């Protein structure tokens, strides 16, 4: 009898055990299961990857192409990570491909959670007959499991910022080199512009030195239909990157679709008229989010949780500009990398320490945050991590 899906997923989750960068294991496994070449869009960057991936998927499907989409992490269900034509992979298909991989791959037991998930995605896209596949890099690029995909392909580097510095390096240049590690010979490369033209020029030179066929930026003189109030300026930039990438890569005649119906989970997403979710988790992303909130919503109430390795002090200072009330939840119970409430309190600067609130349980904290926001006629912003949004959505029983 096939084990229940929850039991099976627990087996898969048990392989998490922290980040395991390195291509050796998955580079041995990938050729064993590879059967069909699929034209690939490969998306790396500190922030904005999700928006670019969902936008590319939307553009390609709107032009009649069958697409595979690979993202991470998921919010509520593992299946969200892998989809074909916008529909998540079914439980039975996950298990069927997992069993196939286990029998086929000699070093299967050495593979990490992310590596197995990537291999499941690739095989599912092959089986489904996808015309295109859009892959989001998990972390960095050079040593990410997705980097076993060969070229030529189309690469997007959305942005470069200081995040995961203990793994990727402590300067923008070091981090950029990790992201640019996805570039292969004859790839088309698109780089999201920064505030420093000299830095952008250096990145383009690095990409060309790796054999890129061409390197371009996100400038685009085309009218794109954006929802008037939903997308932030940063999201619009990443949509433009996706449009430019598709125009560079596809046949002439590609139509730019209307983006008003496109849903990007937890990227300035209103899950109720007075509740906004956003997975911003580092200073550049929170800074961009805070700017959008100021312009669109004014003062809000914030529900916040974080991972231990984030720059909590700087993030809280930025959040403090848009709120007088920061309700904090404990993420350690959900993830061994999560920060406790006390960790966040200890790292809160003098500007915001008097704004922080919490209750005896996370459920009570979330209940109080939402009630306080509604009593005062303000929006509730849920942010700081994928896990913060997941916790709140599970509490509210969204699916």
Regions found by a protein language model. Name each.
Residues 1-45, 52-54, 58-65, 70, ...:
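Short functional linear segments
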Residues 23-36, 62-150, 168:
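ATP-dependent carboxylate-amine ligase catalytic core
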Residues 56, 142-153, 393-396:
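Short Gly/Thr/Asp-enriched flexible loops that form oxyanion-binding sites at enzyme active sites
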Residues 56-61, 125, 319, 348:
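Hydrophobic alpha-helical packing residues
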Residues 127, 132-135, 144-156, 160-161, ...:
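Nucleotide phosphate-binding/pyrophosphate-handling subdomain across enzymes
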Residues 142-143, 150-210, 312:
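Conserved catalytic-core segment of NTP-binding enzymes
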Residues 194-219, 316-379:
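C-terminal helical cap/extension that packs against the catalytic core
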Residues 385:
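Active-site-proximal loop/hinge segments that shape catalytic or ion-binding/gating pockets
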